[in-house]
UniProtKB/Swiss-Prot annotation:
Part of the 50S ribosomal subunit. Forms a cluster with proteins L14 and L19. It comes from the Bacteria. GO terms for molecular function: rRNA binding; structural constituent of ribosome. The modification N5-methylglutamine is found at residue 151. GO terms for biological process: translation. Pfam families: Ribosomal_L3. One of the primary rRNA binding proteins, it binds directly near the 3'-end of the 23S rRNA, where it nucleates assembly of the 50S subunit. PANTHER family: 50S RIBOSOMAL PROTEIN L3, LARGE RIBOSOMAL SUBUNIT PROTEIN UL3C. Keywords: Methylation, Ribonucleoprotein, Ribosomal protein, RNA-binding, rRNA-binding. GO terms for cellular component: cytosolic large ribosomal subunit. NCBIfam families: L3_bact. InterPro entries: Ribosomal_uL3, Ribosomal_uL3_bac/org-type, Ribosomal_uL3_CS, Transl_B-barrel_sf. This is Large ribosomal subunit protein uL3.
Amino acid sequence: MTIGIVGRKSGMTRIFTDDGLSVPVTVVEVDPNRITQVKSVETDGYAAVQVTVGSRRASRVSKPEAGHFAKAEVEAGRTVLELRNESGEQFEVGGLLTVEAFEAGQKVDVTGASKGKGFAGVIKRYNFRMQDATHGNSLSHRAPGSIGQCQTPGRVFKGKKMAGHMGAARVTTQNLEVVRVDVERNLLLIKGAVPGAPGGDVIIRPAVKSRNNG
C-alpha cells in the first residue's frame, strides 16, 4: 500500500488484452520520488510526506530551498509536493517512493492541472444550448440569456454560470484502473484519460471511493 506518487504525463496510447480488445491508456512517467521531509501530527498538526522529483539546475534553486534539500541529503527537483499520510505508514527522509508500490488492476485517483482554454463563453464552458439562429434573434445566438431578476434582489447571485476563464485548474479524476506497471522503465499505464497536457505533473493516489461495477 502506498500514499501516492508524483509523475509526469507522457501521452496516450493503447494496449491489447489477451482477448484482442483495445484499451486506451495514459502513459505516466514516474521517476523515483525523493522524500525531503516527513511531517507528523505532533510537530506539524497533520501527517504528510513531502517529496521532490526530477532535477533542476543549481542556479534555479533559491538558498532556502538549497538548504532544505541539503538537510534531507537529496538532489533538488523540479517541484516539491506533499502527500497526506493517513495510513500511519512510516517513512524516512531521503527515502524513495517508486512505482513498485502499485500493481495492475488497482484503482487510483489522478490529480493534475487541466488544460487551459482561456476566456470561454457559456456554451463551451457550461454546455449551454444555443439560442435560435433566426426567427427574430439578433446578436444573441450564443448569449446566456437572463442572469437574474429585477429590483428584487437587485443583484446577480454568486456562482451564476457566466463566461470567464476556463481550464488551468486543479482537477481530480477518480477510480481509474492501473492497467500495467513497468518497473524497469518507471512507467504506469492508466486506463483512460488523466487531467492535464502531456509533460504536466500529476499526483497518483490510491482511490478513496470504491465503485461497485457489478
